[in-house]
């Protein structure tokens, strides 16, 4: 139980009109620490109690069991709590030094499954910065949900089906060079894809030709299938190389093509339940009662199925296969309407578990304010970007620590971590402008800044030969250490907030605050000097390092021991 929960619990025992949860939401942190550590405003009770807030505050302060606190005083309409810093710091440091990386572990999920649909790049197209967001947000959410007791199933729903394969087949047959594709598959396929789209703008017959080749593919034409399989295999080799660089793993690569033989069953269920209506030759499900104006288009007039039919098949398969407690789709916010339709159709089909489906949208990555587009060839490719980030990180590491061993390995952890962290510190629904120089900076609110704070603490602990197992009683009550203690104590709540809001940026911002607070402490405190507080200061440094490393791990970012 953290301090705010303790206060809320104590107040709930003497306030009849508010429960603990409501009180917790009302608690504030005073701007001036002389006014206490936490304050409860009594305004909300004035109407019910029919008393002035000042009088209520005075009565509450007198009734509080102040043994848990240094003192409890009423100041105007506020009840101000002054915490026993020594006792709380001892308790927090003891918990972290004992539990280590398991500090803040919880069992909220009771080992139930969370399915995370993430990354999902299109086959035969390069892995760009645009795909990065879904990949790193999904990966971070997986770590966060595991931390609070869920098991996760990471699904890479590959874009390995659709009209674009018709376009690619036409382009390859017109202009493709087998040897060139074998040598540089994605580069060559991208050139072909950009060219066919550019030419199709002036020649509509290319579109029709592409549709025809896709129809052949759907009907199992041997040549079409062989080309499709080749494009898929070559793309996957490249994707897996990049996933290895990012240290992201998946439990399933079942993409769109996997559901080709599962969509008829969906159409049959919809038909049996009398949910299909005919509209201009197409089959649709009316969703007006859910406030959704446009019906869900299940089957086109030419008999072709659509994305939503495939996603319905995928949802049914995943529920049956994994019995999920939550099913999360980490997909751009431009798909919001699609996921509203998906949930509504599942609800119409009578599946209560449609409530367990959540679309986790995210904003766009731009470059100099402009939208990126594979089709137009305006794209930032991930592989050269990672290489450049690693190179920039190495230059800075060499300047700071020329004698450092394993520079290449550490530069890789810093460069990749910088890209991931910059993405994840951004509020998920906001976009951001891609700026590699800002990402890899060791100053400011960046991954390298947090990693460097961690490495600095490790250096201090090595010099002191600190062993948490042999440490004794800790007690700190100075202002700088108290700021750190409060953050560390808050870590479990931070993790819960990140999970509840599907928002890794909450963890990233916490990591920045903790690194900043420690750096401030380091600047004002001689940690290694012999003094009565030396062990406590080292324990505080150790606890900060444990929590920083764990926060970075939850973001999928490594924490090098030396930089």
UniProtKB/Swiss-Prot annotation:
The keyword ATP-binding appears for this protein: yes
GO cellular component, one term: cytoplasm
Record-given protein name: Arginine--tRNA ligase
Enzyme Commission numbers on file: 6.1.1.19
Record field: catalytic activity: tRNA(Arg) + L-arginine + ATP = L-arginyl-tRNA(Arg) + AMP + diphosphate
Gene Ontology terms: biological process: arginyl-tRNA aminoacylation
Keywords, ordered alphabetically: Aminoacyl-tRNA synthetase, ATP-binding, Cytoplasm, Ligase, Nucleotide-binding, Protein biosynthesis
One GO MF term attached to the UniProt entry: arginine-tRNA ligase activity
InterPro entries: Arg-tRNA-ligase, Arg-tRNA-synth_N, Arg-tRNA-synth_N_sf, ArgRS_core, DALR_anticod-bd, Rossmann-like_a/b/a_fold, tRNAsynth_Ia_anticodon-bd
Motif ('HIGH' region): 121-131
Coiled coil, from the record: none
Subunit-level organization: Monomer.
């Amino acid at each position: 139980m953290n301090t705010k929960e303790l206060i809320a619990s104590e107040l709930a025992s003497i306030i009849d009109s508010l429960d603990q949860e409501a009180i917790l939401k009302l608690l504030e942190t005073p701007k001036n620490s002389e006014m206490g550590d936490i304050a409860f405003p009594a305004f909300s009770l004035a109407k019910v109690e029919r008393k002035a807030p000042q009088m209520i505050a005075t009565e509450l302060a007198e009734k509080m069991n102040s043994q848990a606190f240094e003192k409890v005083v009423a100041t105007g309409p506020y009840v101000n709590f002054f915490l026993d810093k020594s006792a709380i710091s001892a308790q927090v440091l003891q918990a972290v030094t004992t539990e280590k990386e398991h500090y803040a572990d919880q069992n909220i999920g009771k080992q139930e499954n969370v399915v995370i649909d993430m990354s999902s790049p299109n086959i035969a197209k390069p892995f760009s910065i645009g795909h990065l967001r879904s990949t790193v947000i999904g990966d971070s959410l997986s770590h966060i949900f595991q931390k609070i007791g869920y098991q996760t199933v990471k699904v890479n729903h590959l874009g390995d089906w659709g009209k674009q394969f018709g376009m690619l087949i036409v382009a390859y047959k017109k202009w493709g060079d087998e040897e060139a594709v074998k040598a540089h598959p994605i580069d060559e396929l991208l050139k072909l894809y950009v060219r066919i789209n550019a030419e199709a703008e002036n020649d509509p017959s290319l579109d029709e030709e592409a549709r025809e080749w896709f129809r052949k593919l759907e009907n199992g034409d041997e040549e079409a299938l062989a080309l499709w399989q080749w494009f898929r295999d070559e793309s996957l080799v490249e994707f897996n190389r990049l996933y290895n660089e990012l240290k992201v793993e998946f439990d399933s690569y079942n993409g769109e093509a996997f559901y080709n033989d599962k969509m008829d069953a969906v159409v049959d269920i919809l038909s049996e339940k009398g949910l299909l209506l005919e509209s201009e030759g197409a089959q649709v499900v009316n969703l007006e009662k859910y406030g959704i104006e446009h019906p869900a288009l299940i089957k086109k007039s030419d008999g072709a199925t659509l994305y939503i039919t495939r996603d319905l098949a995928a949802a049914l398969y995943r529920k049956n296969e994994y019995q999920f407690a939550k099913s999360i789709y980490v997909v751009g916010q431009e798909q919001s309407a699609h996921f509203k339709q998906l949930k509504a159709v599942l609800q119409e089909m009578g599946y209560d578990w449609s409530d367990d489906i959540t679309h986790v949208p995210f904003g766009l990555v731009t470059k100099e304010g402009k939208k990126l587009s594979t089709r137009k060839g305006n794209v930032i490719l991930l592989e050269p970007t990672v290489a450049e980030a690693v190179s920039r990180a190495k230059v800075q590491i060499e300047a700071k620590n020329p004698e450092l061993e394993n520079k290449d390995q550490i530069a890789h952890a810093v460069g990749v971590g910088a890209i991931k962290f910059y993405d994840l510190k951004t509020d998920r629904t906001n976009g951001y402008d891609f700026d590699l120089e800002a990402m890899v900076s060791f100053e400011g609110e960046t991954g390298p800044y947090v990693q460097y704070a961690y490495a600095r603490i490790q250096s201090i602990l090595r010099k002191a030969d600190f062993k948490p197992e042999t440490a004794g009683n800790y007690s700190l009550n100075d202002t700088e250490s108290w700021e750190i203690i409060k953050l560390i104590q808050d870590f479990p709540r931070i993790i819960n907030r990140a999970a509840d809001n599907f928002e890794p940026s909450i963890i990233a911002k916490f990591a920045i605050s903790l690194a900043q607070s420690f750096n401030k402490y380091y600047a004002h405190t001689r940690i290694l000097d012999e003094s009565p507080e030396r062990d406590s200061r080292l324990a505080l440094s150790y606890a900060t390092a444990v929590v920083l490393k764990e926060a970075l791990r939850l973001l999928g970012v490594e924490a090098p021991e030396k930089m």
